[in-house]
Swiss-Prot record:
Subunit-structure text: The RNAP catalytic core consists of 2 alpha, 1 beta, 1 beta' and 1 omega subunit. When a sigma factor is associated with the core the holoenzyme is formed, which can initiate transcription. The rRNA transcription and antitermination complex (rrnTAC) consists of RNAP, NusA, NusB, NusE (rpsJ), NusG, SubB, ribosomal protein S4, DNA and precursor rRNA; S4 is more flexible than other subunits. In pull-down experiments interacts with CedA.
Residues bearing the modification N6-acetyllysine: 1022, 1200
Family matches, as CDD domains: RNA_pol_B_RPB2
Matching SUPFAM superfamilies: beta and beta-prime subunits of DNA dependent RNA-polymerase (SSF64484)
Outcome, altering residue 680 to M: Resistant to antibiotics salinamide A and B
Name this polypeptide is given: DNA-directed RNA polymerase subunit beta
Keyword Transcription: yes
Gene Ontology cellular-component terms listed: cytoplasm; cytosol; cytosolic DNA-directed RNA polymerase complex; membrane; transcription elongation factor complex
Matching Pfam families: RNA_pol_Rpb2_1, RNA_pol_Rpb2_2, RNA_pol_Rpb2_3, RNA_pol_Rpb2_45, RNA_pol_Rpb2_6, RNA_pol_Rpb2_7
Keywords, comma-separated and alphabetical: Acetylation, Antibiotic resistance, DNA-directed RNA polymerase, Nucleotidyltransferase, Transcription, Transferase
Catalytic activity: RNA(n) + a ribonucleoside 5'-triphosphate = RNA(n+1) + diphosphate
Length: 1342
């Protein structure tokens, strides 16, 4: 295996055995590809903005003598870059400019004569742009648009499973769901009549829609029924016989023909009888006259002599009618073939309940149902019906819908019109009737072949189209009203509705969510999330168990593990590692093709529908060298069931063992040994881990860590290979390799690093370089680590030495006992950055002012403010300190003449303003790390703002000039090379100042040309620099675009350092969570024979009942990894030669049965081996991939190599007494996470505060500075103790006895500790409520 330069620094030992046929795909492609499709020009007009424009334009005027046509569009450049947008609180977007053409036709002239054409580019609002990491910056905050899993358009056949009617009869229904437009439902009622609903309204007999489509009763019967023909000959009744129709019936008369009796009366007709009749080719049999009674005629019969209707189609025959027919000369009678078995008379029955009899009455009936209360006219009824399903503006099945529709009806072609045809409706009814007759199956709605993914691009396109349609109406009005000769396209288009629709979607749609930015994993998971909620989806209340359940088709598409606990369980899912969407939006997963019993490396992506026809082997099936299956019987999946198949039946094989799970679950080592419920908690809790001060790679990982860290975008990754030319904390410069340079560029890549910025969850984002000067790097190498990454690997927590044993009750009920050493070494110290903003507004009484001159505030409180009233950077502040001094004008009070005089003398201003300064919230303390001042255009900037501006300008200039220097140096080295090659002596050249070099002339023409080109580049570089500097200066000095009425905003950033403390929540990766109960002194912790104390003591009782044994295996393997690290460390300390080190490390990498990883250290230089050993001395990192991990024997081997007991248990001694514990204890290294549920954020106390308006009880919750609820159960407890006075105090003066509590406050102030409880306010509320019910309750004083 080839390792890049960075990967060689620390190679993770991989225990995986299955070959990696397919690399993990780029994890954010579902977001990026979808949005790319939305904004890129699509010549076909199938997707994105192009499709939206083409569907709405051209817009014609009502008269038809002018139209507005769409030509093309382009997106401009964004005004600010992503960082600037976040700082300023604006949206990162680009202006959309559309070229439109206004065509005016001659009025009197023949059709299509053009009078005038005007073309113009029109601004159509801003389109938010996606950042490189798949997010949007909306109003300064990063948001993610979550993909939606919704029911695919098409036709679905379903049943109520016997739940609707009391008899338990199964009622079938069909539903045609378009992409946009009205839903059409067909359903049976308990009497087996077929009904239709449009948009889930009142139901009508289904034949109404057929009549509205201009079918007569005869045609309807002809469509849905086979005919039975009776002939009257010589006063005898004969029937044309189709023997197959008799199957299963009982003969009501002797069936005979040609003098031979085939079936006797009363006998059941069997397949043998039918074969006999077919063999003898019996076509006609005589039937008794009574047999025809009750049959239904298939067409109208008219007496031709009188023109009188004898019987209408769909009438039941009686013997009288038969006689009449016979008399009027009708000898051949067509009736409908029905039976109770598989040809039900449903349509015939429905026609009997159908009140309409022609097209008009059917249309009117539909109109009445859709628009109750409006008087129907013929035109209105016709246009309404036409617009429902047959108009491209109002109805669209979409390509997906048409494909699903045709597949469902077993048609050959999969393309077709987006609107419905007569055949479509009739075929759906026919199929529904077939299902009712027992032929065919109903669909499974939860099958992933019937649910598709709607991603960002598609949802944005739909929203954009909504905006365009709103504009379309206005344009039509303007085209009809305005004077067309003076109008330009610009005058017709109002961009407001479009930008409003787009803004509404990105800002407040249910699927546009505030990004979860706790750590890189939570970002990636959020972008790969799939929600069934949202507009056009399900609602929490309506979703049943079936929708939430894991479905066989989820395999390899949606993760069966990662989903939230609580009301959203199963509705919000996560995309599996290898899953992707196909052109129709269905999820598909990759498989290896099996040809002639050999598993190839050819990869096919299959959707859930396609997969149903194949037999698919699991990824862990054993193969020999050639790729044949070793076992005769292989475990496979087929049609959603898992069973054994012989090896020659297999069509495909899974690509990887981790193809089933999502990214979050694939990071849990030994997932295969954990119970699913706990694995779910583990996957969810990894997303809540807070990035620690120093990231620490997991000793036991799964091999997915690098992919997640790199794809999440928190690290700086090399775009091109080269050599590190410069590196400091804030930037890395790479001199690019010659072969990767573009022609005519300096060949320098500059990476600016993010330093100490705030994430959405207030955690700290900071990048640190992990390369050093002169190192070679390749494309894709990690140059700098972000939060929670260590040498380019995801590192959410810390490796802790844990022991599983009880310790004095401090680990009762999942509590965790932690050593003081963990606090001393700052292992779980995290930095949180809070943003506090102070807004100065223009009020009715005058502007608010930001100043250090605040009334009634002592000197001490102002000590941390500068003269502008803003806190210094670096100040240590605690709760209640002033950060920004601000005064607000107060209403003028009438002054006495004396006061006026004093005011005039002393200029006292304190009385007419009140203090409204920004203070540090209670319970928060930290260091000010940054201050930003935003000033409205036209408002004078204060001193601090100017200082900040100057500093920013200096910094920008410094950055740009350094950048210029680096690029110049690159250029001049190339100029020097050309000059030296052209014959100039190097010594003389170096004595000459650099800017004079370009004045030299060369005799070699080719070299001279090269020199001139380089000179041009140099000028261009300087020009570019000036331009960039000017743009930067303009951006920094220009006023800010603030909300109406806002004059200034001051943002103060506080950094808070949080050490771990009792009450913080910690967890492992296997759903083993707990709260820290005590921080124990190091000397009291249990220690081993070498005197090494453990860091954490966990309760062994937390393991067996929860069945997450993965944590024990992780602990053992962690111990082995650490043991090997210790041996390497000892060798380094003894300064043993490189050969011995190389040999030992090689042994460690080679250990394990047929592992796929082959590390050959003989190809490494001594220096590389030493660096590798240096990085391994704290423990050799190990990968144990999901479902393909380390086996017990391998763990034991590794333990043996590290000179550790293979049981994984050692003897421990009590730190307090020095006595040995009575039995060996499992000790090892487990990866522990600190979760974002910190006790500092939850701790809260109140004495007096705000009260609820109606009940006068204290509010609840920390945010409202609320009280503690003394609930029902607590009242019972006090009642049980008989503590009457305490209870009285709780229910009155400490809660809602208004007079009592003020009195008590007064008493306490006076030093008199007595209380007088009165009437609780909520009791009065109760009285009022009872009175409102008409019961008068009065309290009488005795």
């Amino acid at each position: 295996m080839v390792y890049s330069y960075t990967e060689k620094k620390r190679i993770r030992k991989d225990f995986g055995k299955r070959p990696q046929v397919l690399d993990v795909p780029y994890l954010l492609s579902i977001q990026l590809d979808s949005f790319q499709k939305f904004i890129e020009q699509d010549p076909e007009g199938q997707y994105g903005l192009e499709a939206a424009f083409r569907s709405v334009f051209p817009i014609q005027s009502y008269s038809g003598n002018s139209e507005l046509q769409y030509v093309s569009y382009r997106l401009g450049e964004p005004v600010f870059d992503v960082q600037e947008c976040q700082i300023r609180g604006v949206t990162y977007s680009a202006p959309l400019r559309v070229k439109l053409r206004l065509v005016i036709y001659e009025r009197e002239a023949p059709e299509g004569t053009v009078k005038d054409i005007k073309e113009q580019e029109v601004y159509m609002g801003e389109i938010p742009l996606m950042t490189d990491n798949g997010t949007f910056v909306i109003n300064g905050t990063e948001r993610v648009i979550v993909s939606q899993l919704h029911r695919s358009p098409g036709v679905f056949f379903d049943s109520d499973k016997g739940k609707t009617h009391s008899s338990g009869k199964v009622l079938y229904n069909a539903r045609i769901i378009p992409y946009r437009g009205s839903w059409l439902d067909f359903e049976f009622d308990p009497k087996d009549n077929l009904f239709v609903r449009i948009d889930r309204r009142r139901k009508l007999p289904a034949t109404i829609i057929l009549r509205a489509l201009n079918y007569t009763t005869e045609q309807i019967l002809d469509l849905f029924f086979e005919k039975v023909i009776f002939e009257i000959r010589d006063n005898k009744l004969q029937m044309e016989l189709v023997p197959e129709r008799l199957r299963g019936e009982t003969a009501s008369f002797d069936i005979e023909a040609n003098g031979k009796v085939y079936v006797e009366k009363g006998r059941r007709i069997t397949a043998r009888h039918i074969r006999q009749l077919e063999k003898d080719d019996v076509k006609l049999i005589e039937v008794p006259v009574e047999y025809i009674a009750g049959k239904v005629v298939a067409k109208d019969y008219i007496d031709e002599s009188t023109g009188e209707l004898i019987c209408a189609a769909n009438m039941e025959l009686s013997l009288d009618l038969l006689a009449k027919l016979s008399q009027s000369g009708h000898k051949r009678i067509e009736t409908l073939f029905t039976n109770d078995l598989d040809h039900g008379p449903y349509i015939s029955e429905t026609l009997r309940v159908d009140p309409t009899n022609d097209r008009l009455s059917a249309l009117v009936e539909i109109y009445r149902m859709m628009r109750p209360g409006e008087p129907p006219t013929r035109e209105a009824a016709e246009s309404l019906f036409e617009n429902l399903f047959f108009s491209e503006d109002r109805y669209d099945l979409s390509a997906v819908g048409r494909m699903k529709f045709n597949r469902s009806l077993l048609r050959e072609e999969i393309e077709g019109s987006g609107i419905l045809s007569k055949d479509d409706i009739i075929d759906v009814m026919k199929k529904l009737i077939d299902i009712r007759n027992g032929k065919g199956e109903v669909d499974d709605i939860d099958h992933l072949g019937n649910r598709r993914i709607r991603s960002v691009g598609e949802m944005a396109e739909n929203q954009f189209r909504v905006g365009l349609v709103r504009v379309e109406r206005a344009v039509k009005e303007r085209l009809s009203l305005g004077d067309l000769d003076t109008l330009m396209p610009q005058d017709m288009i109002n961009a407001k509705p479009i930008s409003a629709a787009v803004k509404e979607f990105f800002g407040s749609s249910q699927l546009s969510q505030f990004m979860d930015q706790n750590n890189p994993l939570s970002e990636i998971t959020h972008k790969r999330r799939i929600s069934a909620l949202g507009p056009g989806g399900l609602t929490r209340e309506r979703a049943g168990f079936e929708v939430r359940d894991v479905h066989p088709t989820h395999y390899g598409r949606v993760c069966p593990i990662e989903t939230p606990e609580g009301p959203n369980i199963g509705l919000i899912n996560s995309l599996s590692v290898y899953a992707q969407t196909n052109e129709y939006g269905f999820l598909e997963t990759p498989y290896r093709k099996v040809t002639d019993g050999v598993v190839t490396d050819e990869i096919h992506y299959l959707s859930a529908i396609e997969e149903g026809n194949y037999v698919i082997a699991q990824a862990n099936s054993n193969l020999d060298e050639e790729g044949h299956f070793v076992e005769d019987l292989v475990t496979c999946r087929s049609k959603g069931e898992s069973s054994l198949f012989s090896r020659d039946q297999v069509d495909y094989m899974d690509v990887s063992t981790q193809q089933v799970v999502s990214v979050g679950a694939s990071l849990i080592p030994f997932l295969e040994h954990d119970d699913a419920n706990r694995a779910l908690m583990g996957a969810n809790m990894q997303r809540q881990a807070v990035p620690t001060l120093r990231a620490d790679k997991p000793l036991v990982g799964t091999g997915m860590e690098r992919a997640v860290a790199v794809d999440s975008g928190v690290t700086a990754v090399a775009k091109r290979g080269g050599v590190v030319q410069y590196v400091d904390a804030s930037r890395i410069v790479i001199k690019v390799n010659e072969d990767e340079m573009y022609p005519g560029e300096a060949g320098i890549d500059i990476y600016n690093l993010t330093k100490y910025t705030r994430s959405n969850q207030n955690t700290c984002i900071n990048q640190m370089p992990c390369v050093s000067l002169g190192e070679p790097v390749e494309r894709g190498d990690v140059l700098a680590d972000g939060p929670s990454t260590d040498l380019g690997e995801l590192a959410l927590g810390q490796n802790m030495r844990v022991a599983f044993m009880p310790w004095n009750g401090y680990n009762f009920e999942d509590s965790i006992l932690v050593s003081e050493r963990v606090v001393q070494e700052d292992r779980f110290t995290t930095i949180h950055i809070q943003e506090l903003a102070c807004v100065s507004r223009d009020t009715k009484l005058g502007p608010e002012e930001i100043t250090a001159d605040i009334p009634n505030v002592g000197e001490a409180a102002l000590s941390k403010l500068d003269e502008s009233g803003i806190v210094y950077i670096g100040a240590e502040v605690t709760g209640g300190d002033i950060l920004v001094g601000k005064v607000t004008p107060k209403g003028e009070t009438q002054l006495t003449p004396e006061e006026k005089l004093l005011r005039a003398i002393f200029g006292e201003k304190a009385s007419d303003v009140k203090d409204s300064s920004l203070r540090v919230p209670n319970g928060v303390s930290g260091t000010v790390i940054d201050v930003q001042v935003f000033t409205r255009d036209g408002v004078e900037k204060d001193k601090r703002a100017l200082e900040i501006e100057e500093m920013q300008l200096k910094q920008a200039k410094k950055d740009l000039s350094e950048e210029l220097q680096i690029l110049e140096a690159g250029l001049f080295s190339r100029i020097r090379a050309v000059l030296v090659a052209g014959g100039v002596e190097a010594e003389k050249l170096d004595k000459l100042p650099r800017d004079r070099w370009l004045e030299l002339g060369l005799t070699d023409e080719e070299k001279q040309n090269q020199l001139e080109q380089l000179a041009e580049q140099y000028d261009e570089l300087k020009h570019e620099f000036e331009k960039k500097l000017e743009a930067k200066r303009r951006k920094i000095t220009q006023g800010d675009d603030l909300a109406p009425g806002v004059l200034k905003i001051v943002k103060v950033y506080l950094a808070v350092k949080r050490r771990i403390q009792p009450g913080d929540k910690m967890a492992g990766r296997h759903g083993n969570k707990g709260v820290i109960s005590k921080i124990n002194p190091i000397e009291d912790m249990p220690y081993d024979e070498n005197g090494t104390p453990v860091d954490i003591v966990l309760n062994p009782l937390g393991v067996p009942s929860r069945m997450n044994i993965g944590q024990i295996l992780e602990t053992h393997l962690g111990m082995a990894a650490k043991g090997i690290g210790d041996k390497i460390n000892a060798m380094l300390k003894q300064q043993q030669e490189v050969a011995k080190l190389r040999e030992f490390i090689q042994r460690a990498y080679d250990l394990g049965a047929d592992v796929r990883q082959k590390v050959d250290l003989s190809t490494f230089s001594d220096e590389e081996v030493m660096r590798l050993a240096e990085n391994l001395r704290k423990g050799m990192p190990i990968a144990t991939p999901v479902f393909d991990g380390a086996k017990e024997a391998e763990i034991k081997e590794l333990l043996k190599l590290g000179d550790l007991p293979t049981s994984g248990q050692i003897r421990l001694y009590d730190g307090r007494t020095g006595e040995q514990f009575e039995r060996p204890v499992t000790v090892g290294y487990m990866y522990m996470l600190k979760l974002n549920h910190l006790v500092d954020d939850k701790m809260h106390a109140r004495s007096t505060g705000s009260y609820s308006l109606v009940t006068q009880q204290p509010l609840g919750g920390k945010a409202q500075f609320g009280g503690q609820r003394f609930g029902e159960m607590e009242v019972w407890a006090l009642e049980a103790y008989g503590a009457a006075y305490t209870l009285q105090e709780m229910l009155t003066v400490k809660s809602d006895d208004v007079n009592g509590r003020t009195k008590m406050y007064k008493n306490i102030v006076d030093g008199n500790h007595q209380m007088e409880p009165g009437m609780p306010e909520s009791f009065n509320v109760l009285l009022k409520e009872i009175r409102s019910l008409g019961i008068n309750i009065e309290l009488e004083d005795e």
